[in-house]
């Protein structure tokens, strides 16, 4: 946003990837999008010092790659769960992430205490915290034993175009199953061409035996909207065939999900619209 207002922006990332826990293809595409916008992106940066510039003007960030000067600095270090409540006195244990340990029903090591949201030390998502809260209310009041389906929880990064994803990455899925994956460029999606925003891609990971969908990750126009269909697909344990057999409105960005599903069986790059 600042870059589009004419401000020089530099992004310094400690990791070798811009989005380290996302698919590498998505991370590389996101970096390319930012660089196209004129954002200066540097990976593998170790910040050694931050000091005021000469004559008290601006700031200087000293890194292993050199110095960067800027009028304003935003330091994004993540969030830590607020657990400084002497929880051990209540028999509440912490997990390896420093958050509160819970079971699938969000019950802590003290069976009379539940925990939800950012305090768990997992994904920091408002929608996830809300769902955990409502499920906990049902579990405590009616003993319904409901669980959060973490596999179908989507996420998004609101760059333009959006990065979004749901389910397992290829690296995660390959440790558990025999899998196949496909990548479709947004330049092969009719709606993307119409909008003039063909940057991006969609990647799908599936079981190589029964074709169940394990993960969908994308970067593209309205990606944060498109990923919700993928979340429902994972929630319902659907297969590639289910997506292929579902009629999608043409032209839409959501059609990219059907196209990447079809790409497991055919070359969709030169296919006429709406063909199954």
Label each residue range with its predicted role.
Residues 1-55, 124-130, 138-172:
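Rossmann-like dinucleotide-binding cores of NAD(P)H-dependent redox enzymes
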Residues 2-3, 8-20, 59, 68-69, ...:
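Residues forming the flavin
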Residues 51-67, 73:
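Conserved beta-strand-loop-beta-strand element in the redox core of flavoprotein oxidoreductases
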Residues 53-54, 96, 208-210:
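Short acidic-glycine loop/turn motifs at beta-strand connectors
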Residues 68-142:
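FAD-site-proximal beta/loop scaffold in flavoenzymes
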Residues 93-95, 143-154, 177-182:
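A short alpha-helix-loop-beta-strand transition element characteristic
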Residues 158-276:
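Flexible, glycine-rich terminal cap/loop adjacent to redox cofactors
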């Amino acid at each position: 946003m600042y870059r589009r207002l004419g401000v020089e922006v530099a992004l310094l990332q400690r990791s070798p990837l811009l989005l380290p826990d996302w698919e590498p293809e998505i991370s590389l595409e996101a970096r390319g999008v930012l660089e196209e916008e004129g954002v200066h992106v540097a990976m593998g940066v170790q910040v050694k010092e931050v000091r005021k510039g000469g004559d008290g003007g601006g700031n200087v960030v000293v890194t292993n790659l050199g110095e960067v000067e800027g009028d304003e600095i935003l330091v994004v270090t993540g969030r830590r769960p607020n657990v400084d409540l002497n929880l051990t006195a209540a028999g509440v244990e912490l997990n390896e992430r420093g958050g509160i340990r819970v079971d699938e029903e969000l019950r802590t090591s003290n069976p009379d205490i539940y925990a939800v949201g950012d305090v768990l030390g997992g994904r920091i998502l408002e929608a996830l915290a809300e769902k955990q809260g409502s499920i906990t209310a049902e579990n405590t009041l009616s003993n319904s034993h409901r669980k959060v389906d973490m596999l179908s929880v989507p996420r998004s990064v609101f760059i333009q175009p959006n990065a979004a994803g749901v389910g397992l990455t290829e690296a995660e899925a390959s440790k558990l199953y025999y899998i196949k994956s496909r990548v479709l460029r947004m330049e092969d999606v009719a709606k993307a061409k119409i909008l003039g925003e063909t940057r991006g891609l969609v990647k799908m990971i599936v079981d190589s035996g029964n074709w169940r969908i394990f993960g969908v990750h994308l970067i593209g126009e309205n990606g944060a909207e498109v990923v919700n269909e993928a979340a429902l697909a994972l929630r319902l344990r659907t297969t590639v065939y289910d997506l292929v057999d579902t009629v999608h409105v043409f032209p839409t960005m959501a059609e990219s999900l059907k196209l990447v599903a079809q790409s497991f069986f055919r070359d969709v790059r030169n296919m006429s619209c709406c063909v199954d």
